[in-house]
A protein has these predicted regions:
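Thiamine diphosphate
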Residues: 1-58
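Flexible, low-complexity linker and terminal segments
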Residues: 40-185
Length: 185
């Protein structure tokens, strides 16, 4: 249906079942629903992604998904705050049919969603949350996302010797993935 304001859907996955009865990977939901997704690697990124995610959602007129994992969702840390945004004025949609889930309306919205995929990919390619870091040893390339990136960097406090692609925003940044593949042996 799209949105007329910012909307972030947060899914908290539980890898290794620390506090639930099953493991899930909600990244598949982002891919399946064709909407952008964020995956923070630390508390500051979680804060920044929520802050920027609301603005991005409002700009594109679609919800965005944010994937958290147990270790991050159950943690606390100080964060550097950003300026508070002014409250938007409430208004009714010019076309309320957009929010009525009937096949005729859904097909129109689906077409719009498909047309926006290039915009979502471009946003991901240019996102500061996706970062390629070169390394001197090209025998291995590492792709890390979310808190897994923090675990990687804990093992390399002086910097990783291998090229690393940190993923924080989806759809996957194909140009950066290709750069990693072409760089490594």
């Amino acid at each position: 249906t799209g949105v007329k304001g910012g909307l972030i859907v947060v899914a908290a996955d539980d890898p290794s079942m620390h506090s639930s009865q099953n493991e899930q990977d909600s990244r598949f939901y982002g891919d399946f629903s064709l909407i952008p997704m964020y995956e923070p690697s630390n508390q500051q990124e979680a804060y920044d992604m929520v802050y920027n995610g609301f603005a991005f959602s409002e700009k594109i007129g679609e919800p965005v998904l944010m994937r958290m994992v147990t270790r991050l969702a159950h943690s606390r840390s100080g964060v550097e705050q950003k300026p508070q945004q002014p409250q938007n004025q409430m208004s009714f949609s010019e076309d309320p049919r957009q929010f009525i889930l009937l096949p005729g309306n859904a097909r129109k919205r689906y077409k719009v969603l498909l047309e926006r995929q290039a915009e979502f990919i471009e946003a991901s390619e240019n996102s500061s949350y996706n970062k390629y870091t070169d390394g001197p040893n090209k025998k291995l390339g590492i792709i890390a996302c979310g808190i897994g990136y923090n675990y990687l960097m804990e093992n390399y406090p002086d910097g990783c010797e291998y090229p690393v692609l940190k993923i924080g925003q989806y759809p996957l940044p194909k140009k950066q993935l290709l750069q990693l593949v072409e760089t490594c042996d």
